[in-house]
Each structure stands twice: as C-alpha cells, then as structure tokens.
C-alpha cells in the first residue's frame, strides 16, 4: 500500500502538525522516526490547542495509532506529560501509542550537557537545550541508553554505571551525574508509561501492519535543518528528510507521496543562514501576524519572504513530489508581497544552490506581487500559481487558518476564488 511522508521543506515551523493531523484521519498509523522534544507540533481540535513535542499527531476521534520509531531520541518525562494532557480529554488514548524498544533516550544530564556545550561555544548554535544533540552524540559514541535496556534492572545499572563513569571524568568539575538517581529516574518513568498503557514493540514486530495499512510518516523540523543537507553547523542532530522513514524499516518509492509543507513566507529559529530574512519593523509585523514564536522555546522566530531557491534545493534533496502551502492567510492585507526567485552567488545568478555552504554567500533576487486582503482573491491565486510553476511541483493543498479543517485541495480552493 502506498505511503505518505509529510516533511518540512524550510527551516521547520511550517505547520506540519496541523497538516499531519488533517491527513491522519485517512491513515491507520502515524509514524515519527526522527528528532525528539526539540520539535513542536501545534494541533487544534474542537477549538482547543494541543502542542506535541514527541507524540505523533494522530487523530483524536478515530482509532489511528502512533508509532515512535528508533530514529528518535525520547525524553520519557516529556512523553508522560503529553500523554497525561491527552488522557484528560481522551481517556485510554495512551494505548494507541507504540514505541520501538530500540529507540534511544534523552536523559536529564543530556539537557545539562546541552546547555554547558552551548555556553562554551565561541559561536553558539542556538539549540533548544532539550538535550537532543548530546543524546544523538552519545548514540553515535555507543554510550547511551535504549528503551530495551529498561526491561532488565541489573543490565540497566551496569550500562548506566559505565556511561556515568565516562561522563563524570570528561566533565569533571563542570557537571556530576549520580548513578542511583539516573537508574531510579529511568525505572520510574518506564513504569509510568507502562501503567498508561503504552505498547513497547519493534518495527520488525509490526512489519505486516506497516506494510499492509495506510501509513503516514510525520517529519520533524525541516530539510534545511537536516544534519547532512542543511545549513551546517546550524542544523539539528538527525535526518529531517523523507529518508528517515528507513528507521521504521520502510523504503519510500516513486509511487509514494512525499509531501513538502511550505509556509507562504519563511521563518527560522536560532542562528544560521537565512537569505530572505526581514528585520526591524517589517520583521515585527510579519512575526506578530504569523504568531511566530517557538512552540518549544517561546523564542521569537526570524521571519522573511518565501525563498524559491531554497525550496528548489529542498525539493531535490528529499524528492518532494507534492506541496501543501500553509499560513496563506498571514499575508492578508499586504500591499506588496515579495518572492525570492534565485540568488546571486559570487556575482553569478543561480536558480538553486548546489551545496549548503552556498547559502552563506547568497544574495536574494526578488520578484514583487500585488497583495491581497483574502486568500480567496485572484491575487493570491497568481502568487500561488507562480510559485508552483517555478518549483515544477504541484501545490496540491492550501491551508488558510490554524484549525485542522481550514485546509482545501487546490481544485476546491480554486473554485472558491472570488
């Protein structure tokens, strides 16, 4: 059965949570396979706001399931908090979530380590300080804890003792980790998750279910934050392209839909390249209209015009074959709207950067459009049609508000143009 992957095509915060929540009603299993609690997906259901940092964005009023795959790093305490919020409104919903036992864990000392490393950097990256980088770092260094380790108290203690010995020697005088506190923390949180009814399994165990059912892969962050293809070093510590689906033992094919979520403008959290960034009053206006404040950190997001050169790069890196345009309504009321159609790099005009380092030297080339007061006006359609043609990729859906139902297929959207 064909699969659907929904990924951010910019620097994250494109509105993936709402889009995933909309499409989850047509799918049986929603899979998250990368990142951790550094992602923030906001969902509105019956006029109530829910913010997920870890949980896949399942549909609350269906029987869809969520699967946290082994490409993630999971902060157990955060997961418990999110489940308890949902349990208050949807009793028993925790039983609809599955976790791969081979998934690695974000521990309290990872957060401390994250802050320590950030404070020591000459040029801070602007991390969320949720411990994501150190957790992935420990995974690669073979010194982290996995969910499967929690099933055996004795082996868990041995594992933690070895890790703590290394950490305390590396960070002597900077931070100190206690073995008993760490073990007790892990066992307590694991017990709480079991009592909530979370299922612990593996991609291999549910292989037939994933193969034969309708599956949606929910991306985290955006392609421009990908560890390999993003604006390094100002990136996250995991894969943010559609290829992260391999962590659930799935290989996406040309027959599957890889849907890129594209905001009608652009935003970014933290440091790093941002060719179309706006400043001062222009930035404040767009930030306020779009409510561009981080769901994870609360920080002001940097904002700017939509960037087609960046999007061409993202489409190529993740083989995007469909686009959802979000937050189209935020630009309502602008007299003029700009679109970056390419870059000047070292004095040469380019439609798309060839490598991520090119973003450091990019000077945007703009085309200006007449604005609109409502997305159902012909001027917005002209804006959208131009973008679609330039990217050579169909904008198949348009999202025009925060509610899950405020999304339309393009053909229906066009029929409503005044």
Swiss-Prot record:
Binding site for GTP: 12-18, 40-42, 301, 327-329, 399-401
Pfam families according to UniProt: Adenylsucc_synt (PF00709)
Catalytic residues, chain numbering: 13 (proton acceptor), 41 (proton donor)
Keyword annotations: Cytoplasm, GTP-binding, Ligase, Magnesium, Metal-binding, Nucleotide-binding, Purine biosynthesis
Reaction(s) the record says it catalyses: IMP + L-aspartate + GTP = N(6)-(1,2-dicarboxyethyl)-AMP + GDP + phosphate + 2 H(+)
Binding site for Mg(2+): 13, 40
GO cellular component: cytoplasm
GO term, biological process aspect, one: IMP metabolic process
MF (Gene Ontology): adenylosuccinate synthase activity; GTP binding; magnesium ion binding
Subunit structure, interactors included: Homodimer.
Protein task: Plays an important role in the de novo pathway of purine nucleotide biosynthesis. Catalyzes the first committed step in the biosynthesis of AMP from IMP.
Family: Belongs to the adenylosuccinate synthetase family.
Annotated protein name in UniProt: Adenylosuccinate synthetase
């Amino acid at each position: 059965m064909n699969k659907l992957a929904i990924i951010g095509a910019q620097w994250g915060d494109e509105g993936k949570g709402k889009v995933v929540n909309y499409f989850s009603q047509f799918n049986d299993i929603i899979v998250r396979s990368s990142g951790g609690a550094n992602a923030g997906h906001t969902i509105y259901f019956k006029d109530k706001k829910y913010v997920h940092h870890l949980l896949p964005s399942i549909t609350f009023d269906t029987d869809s399931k969520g699967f946290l795959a082994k490409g993630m790093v999971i902060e157990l305490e955060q997961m418990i908090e999110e489940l308890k919020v949902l349990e208050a409104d949807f009793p028993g919903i925790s039983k609809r979530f599955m976790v791969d036992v081979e998934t690695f864990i974000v521990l309290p000392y990872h957060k401390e380590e994250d802050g320590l490393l950030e404070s020591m950097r000459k040029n801070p990256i602007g991390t969320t300080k949720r411990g994501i980088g150190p957790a992935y770092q420990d995974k690669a260094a073979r010194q982290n804890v996995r969910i499967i380790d929690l099933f055996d108290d004795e082996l868990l203690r041995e594992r933690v003792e070895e890790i703590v010995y290394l950490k305390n020697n590396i960070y002597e005088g900077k931070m100190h980790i206690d073995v008993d506190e760490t073990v007790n923390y892990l066992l307590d949180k694991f017990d709480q998750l079991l009592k909530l009814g979370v299922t612990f399994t593996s991609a291999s165990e549910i292989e037939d279910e994933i193969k034969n059912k309708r599956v949606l892969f929910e991306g985290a962050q955006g392609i421009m934050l990908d560890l390999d293809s993003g604006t390094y070093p100002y990136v996250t510590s995991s894969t943010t392209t559609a290829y992260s689906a391999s962590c659930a033992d799935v290989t996406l094919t040309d027959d599957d839909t890889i849907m890129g979520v594209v905001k009608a403008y652009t935003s970014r959290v933290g440091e790093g390249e941002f060719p179309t960034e706006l400043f001062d009053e222009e930035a404040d206006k767009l930030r306020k209209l779009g409510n561009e404040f981080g769901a994870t950190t609360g920080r002001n997001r940097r904002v700017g015009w939509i960037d087609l050169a960046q999007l061409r790069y993202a489409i190529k890196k993740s083989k995007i074959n469909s686009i959802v345009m979000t937050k189209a309504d935020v630009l309502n009321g602008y007299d003029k709207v700009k679109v970056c159609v390419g870059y000047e790099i070292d004095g040469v005009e380019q439609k798309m950067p060839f490598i991520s380092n090119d973003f450091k030297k990019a000077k945007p080339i703009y085309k200006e459009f007449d604005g609109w007061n409502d997305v159902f006006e012909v001027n917005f359609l002209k804006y959208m049609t131009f973008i679609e043609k330039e990217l050579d990729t169909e904008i198949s859906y348009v999202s025009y508000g925060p509610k899950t139902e405020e999304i339309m297929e393009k053909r229906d959207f066009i029929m409503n143009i005044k």
